[in-house]
């Protein structure tokens, strides 16, 4: 009996560990034209930037933020950041092709628009707090 309970605990521990290693799954349904980008995002980006790209309780910043809108951070800059990385982000050039990066950027831009972000949103929020 003791041996059986030890095996059950061991199996349960392994299953919990394995499920925690899986990339976060999409949390929202997106139009078909953005689904491919969402899939690539969840395979490569979501572990750090969060399943919903908000970055809450993750190692990396949220991308659904006015700082990363195209007016502040162009598609070319985002592409370069993804491919080349930075001191805070590993390069993803070995994980993604150019078309895959383009799909991810398209998905991020869609997600930003869906969140109704506008440039300067943070500043207006600060003014309201004062």
Model-predicted regions and their roles:
Residues 22, 48-54, 83, 109-110:
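Detector for the c-type heme attachment site
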Residues 10-15:
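Classic N-terminal secretory signal peptides
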Residues 1-9:
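Bacterial N-terminal signal peptides that target proteins for export
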Residues 52, 67, 86, 111-115:
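A general structural signal marking secondary-structure boundaries and capping sites
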Residues 24-27, 31, 42, 90-130:
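Flexible coil segments in periplasmic/lumen-exposed cytochrome c-class electron-transfer proteins
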Residues 32-38, 50, 54-80:
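Gly/Gly-Pro-rich "capping" loops immediately C-terminal to redox-active cysteine motifs
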Residues 17-20:
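C-terminal motif of bacterial Sec signal peptides marking the signal peptidase cleavage site
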Residues 39-50, 61-62, 80, 87-91, ...:
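C-type cytochrome heme c attachment motif
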């Amino acid at each position: 009996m003791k041996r059986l309970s030890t095996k059950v605990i061991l199996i349960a521990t392994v299953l919990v560990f394995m499920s925690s290693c899986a990339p976060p799954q999409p949390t929202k349904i997106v139009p078909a034209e953005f689904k491919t980008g969402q899939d690539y995002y969840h395979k490569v980006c979501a572990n750090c930037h969060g399943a919903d790209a908000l970055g809450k309780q993750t190692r990396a910043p949220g991308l659904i933020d006015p700082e990363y809108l195209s007016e502040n951070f162009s598609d070319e800059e985002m592409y370069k950041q993804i491919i080349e990385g930075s001191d805070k982000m590993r390069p993803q050039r070995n994980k993604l092709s150019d078309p895959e990066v383009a799909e991810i950027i398209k998905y991020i831009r869609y997600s930003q628009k869906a969140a109704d972000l506008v440039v300067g949103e943070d500043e207006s929020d600060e003014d309201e707090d004062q």
